[in-house]
Amino acid sequence: MPSAEDKLKPGAAVSGRETQRLQTRQRVYAAALAEFKRTGMAAADVRDIAAAAGVARGTFYFHFPTKEHVLAEFERLEEARLVAQLAKSVAQLEARCGPPSSSGPEFLTAALNEVVRLLTAMERRVGKTLFREMLGLHFSPRRPDVLPGADQWAAYPIMTILVEAVGRARERGEVYAGADALHTAQLFMVGLYAMLIASHEYPKAMRAEILDNFMATILRGVQAR
């Protein structure tokens, strides 16, 4: 089903009324994100969001049943952007990596480092507060049904890419033969999100050290011996 963003793209066939509805939805969405950046989602007041968008309070709920639904839409769009970049990067990485060596899992290290790079770049682009709110939604009991549940990590496109990357690393002999690709990818993503949330206010050098140690732990756990 096309998203609201897709329907607003040039060339999309929509009626005048539908265009107006989508434009109103986009104003509400943009106003909500701006307020989330300013105060955090929990403290954001729907009345302030509606006023900033120039609509009635009820109009917010017409388009988004809860504030979490705004964040879910943001996550969906940002993940689509990240997945497109990651898929392109991972496709190039194995070609750049030479044959497996005794020095360690070169391809898998590069692939996981690319995930970290893309996520931290996203954090700089959208701001720490909104980024933290987005990651926190993965662990929230109020997570909207429009997103996969907390126990459905395999349903995320980014997980599909990571599972394939772990599988290719296993075929290259970088990862031990019994390593489960899905569980390895899930452990990495859950741990990475938790680390990024917990360390978002840390000094840059300290955070980099924490992420490096986390990465080393994951890689040591699956490295072929």
Residues covered by each model-derived region:
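C-terminal peripheral helix-coil segments that are non-catalytic and often amphipathic
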Residues: M1-A12, E114-A121, M159-R172, Q186-R225
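N-terminal intrinsically disordered/low-complexity leader segments
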Residues: M1-Q23, E94-C97
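Generic hydrophobic, amphipathic alpha-helix propensity
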Residues: Q20, T24-A32, I49, F74-E78, ...
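Hydrophobic/aromatic residues within well-ordered alpha-helical segments
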Residues: T24, E78, L82, L112-V115, ...
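Helix-turn-helix
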Residues: R27, E35-H69, E73, L77
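Hydrophobic alpha-helical connector segments
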Residues: E73, A87-K128, T184-F188, A208
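Amphipathic alpha-helical packing segments from all-alpha helical-bundle domains
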Residues: V83-A87, A110, T129-G136, S140-R172, ...
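Secondary-structure edge/capping motif, primarily at the C-terminal ends of alpha-helices
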Residues: S89-C97, E133-M134, H138-P141, M195, ...
